[in-house]
Amino acid sequence: MATKVKSQAKLRFVSVEQVQSAIKEIGDLSREHTRLATEMNDKIGATSEHYAPKLKALKEEIEPLQKAVQEYCEANRDELTEFGKTKTANFVTGEVQWRQRPPSVAIRGAEAVMEFLQRMGFDRFIRTRQEINKEALLNEPEVAKGIAGVTIKQGLEDFVIKPFEQDAR
């Protein structure tokens, strides 16, 4: 039979002094957390700054190679795809693929397009979204309580601990 791992005893305070000490410790730990997060972000920034030129140089080296491979493959597409029987051409070191993107719609000037569609009677191209008005439900809580699936939450309280900190000036 497996042995049960004992859980850590629950921390309890019985005096104001203990609570004050705990709030001070929360502040100290929070500041240390912030300091470490800042240090981590500084190192991430320095690392990114260090590698950015190298990555850019590699990308600039890759781009002409990609263009040349694409030009060759486009020029020899029939031979590589067995006259369109396949969409992939295999080479010893890798493969190239031709993939048709699905159709998409790009809209510039959405308001003008919307007005035109409405004016021309193209309502089938307009989507009307319905959603529940939560503000109206909150304004009429007595009516809302009688609706199945609707719950009005009231009197919820958050407990916030704010250790005092001196602002550096």
Swiss-Prot record:
**In its UniProt record, which GO terms are filed under biological process?**
DNA protection
Entry keyword DNA-binding: yes
What GO molecular function terms would the record report?
double-stranded DNA binding
Which positions form S-S bridges? none
Is Electron transport one of the keywords? no
Pfam families, sorted: Phage_Mu_Gam
Keywords annotated in UniProt: DNA-binding
Q: Which residues cross the membrane?
A: none
Family assignment from sequence similarity? To phage Mu protein gam.
> What does this protein's UniProt record list under function?
Protects linear double-stranded DNA of Mu genome from exonuclease degradation.
Please identify the protein, giving its name as recorded: Mu-like prophage FluMu host-nuclease inhibitor protein gam
Organism for this UniProt entry: Haemophilus influenzae (strain ATCC 51907 / DSM 11121 / KW20 / Rd)
